């Protein structure tokens, strides 16, 4: 880009876009190539290129910060012209800058780029720093000494003008500005030289800095002697390689191989890569240059690209506002109060300790209850990048940790790939379906996960392909699972389990009303007054067309209605419609599901149990009857082993206490008892139907009708104790929905009644029981 005039404000202030570098200091009259990869920098370059304007190049104070604030940037920089040397496939640039003059940044501001994606970048109004080029005789001698001493270093610089190798009065200020680039000065020293307007004082500072460097070299001389042999060998190799390169260049036979190598070296020198990574990259670059065939070159180049593109210092700033996190979670997710409370507590401790170490969150719950979207909301709330790896069905350890480079087509594992995609060292990293990890002869991925999730080890994670330690300690890992019992025990030990239960119908209604309908209307290009849903219509969809723990089927049903309505809009010129129960039936046709309701008539031997299912809960009718026989018991209804045992325990308890219950003990040898649980196509298991089975048997034997509005749940022992069960919330809601408002449950489950919505609790009677006598006294006396 040619040197063009920059914009001026109404007050004649000069304005230019600002490129912030990681410790690279520019000077007037110099020329250097820089790799540009940060989004802000790319946006600033594109804007300046489009407007054909020069830029201010200035360094940030701390090179390790990925996104410096205004206060973390030096206020003196260099106005530069620039040309784009190369644009890389990932959108980054190689830019050659030419320094024009020293400038003082008066005011640094931000603005957004043009185009669809708005990226903020810095611009500034600035003023030129007037330079004093007068020299005393002693300083004239000093510049001659410096030029003579460091002539080779200057000559080795890629863009140093050969015409300036001979010192003259006209070019001495140019030589002084090139010297800090040729010599190994610290960032602070380089910035001091940029901010100094006096040529005489700049020479004095350079003399001072080089003397300090010489003292340091003298201290290290003994160490240098010990490695002279190896160094001499390396210098010889370097010399010969450069000779070959020079000959090829002279013949016009220079290939892109050398250009690639030099570009990689520049990128490594100009960025704060960890020392062991720098060493490995430079070693691989040497192999790249000496590779003799295209396959070898391609493999080396691919490996270097993976190694150099991984994030090592880039990070997003941490968010310290719990209120912001809470707002995002509440806006994106209805209900789940206890889950959100646990997440807030977990994040609060991380924020306070400023440490990434600690247990890993694992969200456990049925499909569709919002585990993945919760993880995405956490990333959004913390303003962090979000990446996801699906672990379902993974059986090969190499999928996680990569294949060794000796294999054809070797690549890094999914962890390294995801980190490269994130582009920062501290993303939110979702490990989806961790309970579905498998294992076979190729290895055990669950064991490989231990290195990744253990905070004491994951700062040295080793991928088989990368072969260098990589730090995962800044990553916020979140795992998800459907079934907690399927998580391998060593992994389970490292996880903090947060359980998400299935949504109630009221919760599903609120989610559909406040989230799903709005989302689907936007997707279908419909306005909110074109298609409206009543509460009755949405409730009918939930009850009669879906049976699930989450809301995915509800979303599909609403989307189906929206599609069919759009078709009618096009064909029948229908302008708007309100969707109630009848409209739902019209669009979705025949109902798919029904929920179990209480019987209208009372009958001996029939009792309502309460079932917990993956779709929430349901009433579980239990029937018992007997006929003359020889004391046999028949059990039907597709009952699994545990529930069959519950039938036998219930019968054993009744037999033992027959006299107390007013039953002749002899009758058990004279009848055959039959226990049946309807809906035989559905497998049923668990011990929680114990007291319902006992009541059904007693009701049949005593010929006592149990009111159909009664439902019960609880495990029973042979001594008549009623033991704690799970799924209190789901069972209670389903019982109320089915018409049962008089519920018996174990005393020990009292602690879970707070989970039951108030609108349900206020309309039912709950009897808490310690022993079966409490049930018997209420129903049979």
From Swiss-Prot:
Domain Lon N-terminal: 16-214
Pfam families, sorted: AAA (PF00004), Lon_C (PF05362), Lon_lid (PF22667), LON_substr_bdg (PF02190)
Gene Ontology biological-process annotations: cellular response to heat; protein quality control for misfolded or incompletely synthesized proteins
Amino-acid positions noted as binding ATP in the UniProt annotation, renumbered to this chain: 365-372
Alphabetical UniProt keywords: ATP-binding, Cytoplasm, Hydrolase, Nucleotide-binding, Protease, Serine protease, Stress response
Reactions catalysed: Hydrolysis of proteins in presence of ATP
Record localization: Cytoplasm
EC number of this enzyme: 3.4.21.53
Induction description: By heat shock.
Entry GO CC: cytoplasm
Annotated catalytic residues: 688, 731
Top-rank taxon: Bacteria
Disulphide bonds in the chain: none
GO molecular function, one term: sequence-specific DNA binding
InterPro entries linked: AAA+_ATPase, ATPase_AAA_core, Lon_bac, Lon_bac/euk-typ, Lon_lid, Lon_proteolytic, Lon_Prtase, Lon_prtase_N
Primary subcellular site in the record, as a coarse category: cytoplasm
Domain (Lon proteolytic) ranges: 601-781
Family: Belongs to the peptidase S16 family.
Biological role: ATP-dependent serine protease that mediates the selective degradation of mutant and abnormal proteins as well as certain short-lived regulatory proteins. Required for cellular homeostasis and for survival from DNA damage and developmental changes induced by stress. Degrades polypeptides processively to yield small peptide fragments that are 5 to 10 amino acids long. Binds to DNA in a double-stranded, site-specific manner.
Subunit details: Homohexamer. Organized in a ring with a central cavity.
Protein name: Lon protease
Species of the source: Malacoplasma penetrans (strain HF-2) (Mycoplasma penetrans)
